[in-house]
């Protein structure tokens, strides 16, 4: 049950704890979390997976596409408002899925990696994003018309099934031959309507919608089975160490820290000094220069993909952004779109001094010429707001909830979103320059409100469409943001005037 009070709309600007109970009625030991468009996943230390939120395409993997709640809520939207265990089919019988080591949620679909390197997917399958190939059959209700308005009679899968890859000589996808089940996978990421996986030999495969080149196999066609990503010369892309799938684009960090991207580039989000979409892995450059090797972005450790914005973290801790920059959402206080990676400048250049961060508060100097954008903070950053005004003068104290510290960036809608996991005692907020009206990022340390000498650690955080899921170092899961589809997992979606269910 939640341990904090929610806002009266049913959404919350402060973190609420999600109750995830195991078979023995003890709290499950959660080690990883993931967030899709309107659903969430949580992985336990024993390899099981829990899910909650929107379930109209079976993206929760529980064997149904209906509405369930501890309060027996019945309505038009299929959802689970509290966590449920993801199921598996074993000899035709439903059992709890097990031995999972990696999870990802994207759009209305989910993907899991088992310890033996096999991949299981479920949810919406209309563009091949589940990677079933010719093995997709109509059973367990994946075309069951729970409501024509909900599934539009499109294929979906309510129980995890194993994904397949196509033969390597079938890169054109014409009359493709299914080869084998996908194997030796170490990492998987589900995008909006496509998925990308990393094999233990450094090769990258993808499946699903490919009309913008987001599959990276050299063509702009969709596929219902995994195909191998190639580089700009048509050779198999190799030496990848991590991968990421976005809205209509994909990315991979190669050994040595080089960043490669492919897919939609209409907003310059590929960072290759152009606005032309790419169907093969293309290296990201710095600024507008591609004349020398030193002009390529290097030493990248983490990459995060939004709709039209890309953010990368360097080994030295610097943050690099590129893509659309409406109102300065790339964090550099200008209104210029970058076709190559641009480093977010030092915050003290703009006279913002956060040296006196303590006790969970940040004090902004009274002579600062900035205002805090509270619209962004209200739904994502979890601030303890003083009133409902859109903007507040920068001077004075601002409180952080103790569950919120992280490094984040701003997406195309001006919303704060995280860029990587494992961040310790850091939070990023947006501020608005009163002289130009452009927004930028400010990073500050955050300490425990009850112990001003102790920083707070959150090892993992994930953002959905307009909500956030955080895993604290003690294994507890906290959520905040929009809760219209039960994606916060707290047992209800609406509150009465007293803030109670």
Which role fits each region the language model picked out?
Residues 423-435:
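A short beta-strand micro-motif common to beta-rich folds, especially ectodomain repeats
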Residues 396-410, 485-486:
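Short, solvent-exposed loop/linker segments at beta-strand-coil boundaries, enriched for Pro/Gly
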Residues 1-15, 53-81, 122-161, 173-176, ...:
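Short glycine/serine- and acidic-residue-enriched loop/turn motifs that recur at repeat junctions
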Residues 350-394:
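Solvent-exposed, low-complexity, repeat-rich "mucin-like" stalks and linkers
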Residues 1-8, 15-18, 28-33, 311, ...:
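An edge-strand/N-cap motif at the start of beta-rich repeat modules
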Residues 39-42, 51, 109-112, 121-122, ...:
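Conserved core positions of repeat-based scaffolds
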Residues 411-424:
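Extracellular/luminal low-complexity segments enriched in Ser/Thr/Pro
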Residues 434-443:
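Short, exposed coil/turn segments at beta-strand boundaries within extracellular/luminal domains
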């Amino acid at each position: 049950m939640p341990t904090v009070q929610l806002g009266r709309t049913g959404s919350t600007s402060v973190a609420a704890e999600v109750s995830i109970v195991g078979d023995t009625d003890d709290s499950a030991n959660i080690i990883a979390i993931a967030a899709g468009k309107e659903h969430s996943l949580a992985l336990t230390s024993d390899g099981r997976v829990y899910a909650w939120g929107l379930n109209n395409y079976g993206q929760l993997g529980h064997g149904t596409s209906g509405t369930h709640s501890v309060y027996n809520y019945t309505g038009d939207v299929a959802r689970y408002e509290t966590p449920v265990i993801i199921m598996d089919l074993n000899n035709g019988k439903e059992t709890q899925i097990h031995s999972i080591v990696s999870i990802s949620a994207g759009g209305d679909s989910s993907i899991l990696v088992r310890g033996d390197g096999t991949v299981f997917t479920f949810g919406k399958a209309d563009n091949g994003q589940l990677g079933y190939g010719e093995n997709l059959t109509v059973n367990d209700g994946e075309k069951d018309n729970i409501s024509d308005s909900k599934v539009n009679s499109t294929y979906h899968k309510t129980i995890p099934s194993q994904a397949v890859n196509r033969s390597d000589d079938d890169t054109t996808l014409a009359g493709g031959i299914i080869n084998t089940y996908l194997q030796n996978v170490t990492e998987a990421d589900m995008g909006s309507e496509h998925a990308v996986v990393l094999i233990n030999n450094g090769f990258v495969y993808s499946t699903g919608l490919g009309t913008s080149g987001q599959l990276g196999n050299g063509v702009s066609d969709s596929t219902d089975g995994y195909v191998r990503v190639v580089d700009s010369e048509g050779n198999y892309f190799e030496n990848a160490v991590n991968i990421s799938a976005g809205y209509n684009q994909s990315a991979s960090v190669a050994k040595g820290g080089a960043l490669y991207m492919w897919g939609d580039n209409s907003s310059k989000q590929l960072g290759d000094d152009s606005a032309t979409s790419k169907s093969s892995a293309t290296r990201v450059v710095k600024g507008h220069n591609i004349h020398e090797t030193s002009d390529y972005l290097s030493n990248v450790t983490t990459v995060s993909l939004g709709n039209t914005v890309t953010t990368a973290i360097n080994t030295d801790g610097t943050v690099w952004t590129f893509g659309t920059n409406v109102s300065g959402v790339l964090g550099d206080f200008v209104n210029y779109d970058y076709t190559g990676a641009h480093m977010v400048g030092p915050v003290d250049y703009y006279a913002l001094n956060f040296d006196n961060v303590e006790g969970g508060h940040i004090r902004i100097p009274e002579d600062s010429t900035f205002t805090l954008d509270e619209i962004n903070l209200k739904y994502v950053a979890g601030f303890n707001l003083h009133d409902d005004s859109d903007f507040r003068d920068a001077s004075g104290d601002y409180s952080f909830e103790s569950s919120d510290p992280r490094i984040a960036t701003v997406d195309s809608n001006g919303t704060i979103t995280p860029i990587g996991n494992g961040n310790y005692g850091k939070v990023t907020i947006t501020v608005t320059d009163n002289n130009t009206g452009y927004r930028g990022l400010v990073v500050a340390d955050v300490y425990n409100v009850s112990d001003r000498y102790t920083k707070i650690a959150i090892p993992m955080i994930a953002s959905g469409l307009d909500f956030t899921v955080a895993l604290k170092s003690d294994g507890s899961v906290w959520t905040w943001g929009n809760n219209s589809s039960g994606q916060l997992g707290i047992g209800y979606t609406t509150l009465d005037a007293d803030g109670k269910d």
